[in-house]
Amino acid sequence: MKKSKITFLIAELFLVVIAGFFIHQIFREDVPQKRVAVILSNSGDKRWDGLINGLKQSANVNDVHLIICNTDDIESAQDEKELIDEQLENDVDAFIICPAPGEDTSDMLGQLGDVPFVLITQDAYSEDGASGFVTIKPDNYKIGYTLGEQIRANDADGLRGKSIGIITGYSQTEGSVSGKAGLMDAIEGTGCEVSWVYSRCGNPNICDIVDILGKVDYMVVMDTY
């Protein structure tokens, strides 16, 4: 799966570069130092290291005061709203946000009004399609599709008669929905069976969950646990 690792590394590098460009563009005027709050679910997770380091470097170059909010898992729009409100009380000028799961998140973010913000890693979830917010993200559908293509190509029988288990992040997120859709399209018509799909709920012991769900020929994990 070396190619898939490269795909994810390229996606992470893309996020770092574009998020840095956002900081440069939004505050390029000659004004006093601005404050930007970064809200990421479980901000201490190592998966954010590259992104945070890139943002810090860009903030330093552009004389921006970057605030990395200390967070646990953000499971709802209300969780995220509390973090946003706290930073607004601290007079931040803009936000970089990984949107919370759930269909209420888009409406909550819309209430920010004139406060600048950009979404990263995924769009806000909506059954109607794109939210319309400024979003910096990889092509989550294509990532899922590429994973499906690789599994199919590496299986001697082209997946015919094989079983697959899918593990995603929270169900009501654009990243999970798009990634799963891409995977399903890639394996369509192969004759394989999707035995189960598990979406994150809280902070489970994923090994115990997998033991309960049962054995499959291939397991596709589309989020960090």
Write out the residue ranges for each language-model feature.
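Hinge/beta->alpha junction and helix N-cap segments in small-molecule ligand-binding domains
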Residues: 39-47, 68-78, 136-146, 166-182, ...
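Extracytoplasmic/secreted envelope proteins and their assembly/folding machinery
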Residues: 52, 56, 80-84, 88, ...
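Hydrophobic alpha-helical
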Residues: 96-117, 183, 199-225
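Ser/Thr/Pro/Gly-rich low-complexity linker/stalk segments immediately outside membranes or between
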Residues: 25-42, 50-53
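Hydrophobic membrane-insertion alpha-helices, especially the h-region
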Residues: 8-22
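Hydrophobic alpha-helical segments within soluble ligand-binding/sensing domains
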Residues: 134-161
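Short, polar/charged alpha-helical segment
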Residues: 48-66
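Flexible loop/hinge segments that line or gate small-molecule binding clefts
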Residues: 104-142
